[in-house]
Amino acid sequence: MNMKIKASLIVAVSCMAVVAASDFALAGKFNAYYTKIDSGEAFEKYCRTGAYADIVVDLANGAFVFWRGSSYIPYWQTREGRWFVDEVIERSGDGPVKRPDKVNTYSRVALVESGPDKAVVYWRYLPRFGGKNPHAGVDATKFVDEYFTITADGNVTRTIRQGTAKIDDWRDPGNKTVQTFRLTPDGIMDKKTQRPGLSGKAEAAKGAQVKANSVGNPVAWWKFDEAQGDVAVESVSGEKGTVEGHKSLWEKGVSGTALQFDGYNSIIRLSAARGPKVSSALTLEGWIAIGAYPWNWAPIVQQADDVPEELKQLKGRRAWLTGEEDQEEEDEEEEYFDFALKKENDVGYFLGIDGLGHPGLKVRVGQVWEELVSDTHLGRRRWYHIAGTYDKQSGKMNIYVDGKPAGERKVSKSDIILSSKDIKIGKGKPRRPIRPVRANTFVDFYSFDGLLDEVRIHDTALSAAEIARSYETFKPIEYDRDNPDMDKRVLPAGRSTGKFGAYYTHLKFYETWDNLWRFSEHPDIVVEFDEQPTKFVFWRGVGYIPMMVNEKRQWYSNEFNETWNKSGGQGCQEPMSDKESYTNHVRIIENTDARVVVHWRYPLVDVFHVIANYNEDTGWGDWSDWYYYIYPDGVAVKTMHLWTNGERNHEWQEGMAILGPDQHPEQVLETEPSLMLGDLKGNVERYNWVDGPPDDVDYDNKKIHVVNYKADYDPYTIGNFEGGNVYGGEVTDYAVFPSWNHWPVAQMPSDGRYASFPDRTAHSSLTHVWLPIYREDFSDRPYEQKIMMEGMSDKSPEELVPLAKSWLKPAKIKVESGCSSQGYDRSQRAYQLISQASKLSFIIDASENSPVVNPCFVIKKWDCPNNANLKINRGTIQSPKNLRQGIVRDTDGSRTLVVWLKITSVKPLNVSIATSEED
């Protein structure tokens, strides 16, 4: 589709922008910037977007525009008309034809590169979906990434990558439609399109030495020695089974190659018709290396009816917080919440691992589904041989680990009742994760997470001696046993450039998790510093919830907006629930030597993606736009903007330690003290968390909140706190801090699951602080806004007092000449000025009560393309690290100068700023 609007219609849209369409269409110079276009259309009356909703690229003869009114398919506008680019991939959703994504739930744009001669715009969208709230047909493998590279001479290269079921197809260099065209005064010309063509090439994995012998005569045997492709052969029947999931990941096994399962989607099937028939005896065996313990039972191999779980009742306590008033009486009979399930009553057989790392054998013997669970606990990242047997003659079930008995059970001497369903490897029936925190934990499919090799079925019960020989036959050497071919799982933290600034990147975690996603080169953002070893990380694995990372790669977050109760949906509605990053996203708005501005946008959804406080007429519910103003001293101020017409009982802050695999909470958090609260007079209260949470925490008059990490750099939060609390419940014997692993990274419909091991990413929630409203509105686009300062520092709470004062009680500014002042904007940690001449001078009236600490000056309408000369008290600043500046484009396309000074003062500062032509 190539839509054109002739010049006769331009009059109707000439007021289309905060910068009018007639203005940006004739700008005359190459320039790209964020803005918000106001076309006057009816949908904009209720549009819950901020000042950076759209992108304009100005060229000599017109403007190339990415507008939310078209769900961001761009158009070219000149004096002669308006032309949309081709809709190469057809779009349809919950909106009108022109704006198929009604409120752009899944459509967004980012300006990933902007220079004097070239701009690159990234457009991501879901081409087809249906329904309302929640939407139907939403799938992480179906998103489309488009890039537009626009040069100053009007040439455009457009690349289109469409989501694929298999990650290798997504990554294939041939999975790309490339279109080129020219932007001319008379329209879009010289279009050429090259369609995608997949290469289909795959390299074979390198395996161990193949061991061909087998103890006994298996009636089914998956050797997993294919080493490449999407087929695994059952070697007895010769039947080929498709390896289902995002990728067939072949790795070195105990013999030849093994197959790695991702914990969610991976599965191999063999039809019951081609499978072995067992009746009076059975042996199931296989080699496994666990990456993370299953959420619940996961099979190594099974043939079962997969009778659904039946819920008998809910039991246990609710969550609570110390400091809450009017707490409900707790059920003292149950220590924790849990689901009481009816006894499983399946048909067939099953060998697998439970959610706590114990191997188990289950068999339908006569009329009873018998279960044998070993007391042996299996470690992670180590090869084990697991075997289970049943023998009708002896009436015994046995289980073995590494060739040794690990459990037995006497059962009736009856035949095995065989299931008519497919044999499955790696994945069974949908289950609820074990150890739920609350009722909003739902049934879903999960698979084994780790490596599987040499899976065999026998129609006889191998003896203990034969099981031992089977183990010895395939046993790897000690080094290989303890170092299976799996990625180590370490939270990603970027490149460590040693420079201050932000960059887009594609952060890697571990391969089977990375394979779940269809993102191109720019999904994530990292902000780094040149004078301290901390970072801000905005990563899709945490739903882009902003993370502060210290020198020991320990993560912390002050979290997000959250609502519940009367907002619709199931349980908590929060960005944490967008586990697939369907909707949450981040963009770099500013990136200069003086500061970085990052925009994080998200809807408040439950685990089924039901948006809170949804209005069917407008399509809008609760959305948040958070803006991070990050400076070279490692300090960030965030403006938290929540759009809502619901009950205003949202959460705005939750202090959390984010834990990577193999990080226990008590390896990251100090217990003596854990929390420090300070006021502006330098008084600090310190709270221990030795045997559990403190119950005497007092937030009165406190402005500084520090969580004590086992590192030099600790996370701090500064604000006009109106109160707060400490998590006082949901503590288990795993740690003195409450710890859960339903988030981050986990792809499961749950808003609460207790951690039992440090096998997965997890988090420990510690505190809440309550903040005053900074701005609000109750009109057609109702919102609340609050602000907060945060960062990581090696300073004590007492040493943070000057910084807190400089922001909470900022020194006043007095203009002397050359500009007007809009005062100090606490939401940006910056003085706001409008230039009226080439030389500006003003006084910052610093004092003991209102000190200056590393101030920023934002000077709009800066007429010069170059940086400025600056003097303090008539002296120049010599060190470039003490004076940092940059020029950005405002939302009207004009220049803005941003200046940051590394200076602390309790005395007035005389500041003069001049263009380089002035001195």
Specify the residue positions occupied by each region the protein language model found.
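Extended, loop-rich substrate-binding clefts of extracytoplasmic carbohydrate-active enzymes
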Residues: 96-152, 156-162, 568-632, 636-639
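Short hydrophobic/aromatic patches on beta-strands that form ligand-binding or substrate-lining surfaces
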Residues: 221-222, 284-292, 386-388, 425, ...
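Localized edge beta-strand/strand-to-loop motifs within extracellular or lumenal beta-rich domains
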Residues: 163, 382-396
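Surface-exposed beta-strand/loop patches in extracellular or lumenal glycoproteins
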Residues: 179-182, 653-658, 704-712, 718-723, ...
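Acidic-aromatic substrate-binding/catalytic surfaces of carbohydrate-active enzymes
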Residues: 24-107, 128, 494-584, 590-593, ...
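Short, aromatic/His-centered strand-loop micro-motif at the edge of beta-sheets
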Residues: 361-385, 442
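Extracytoplasmic low-complexity segments
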Residues: 204-265, 283, 293-298, 303-306, ...
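Flexible glycan-contacting loops in extracellular carbohydrate-active proteins
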Residues: 409-451
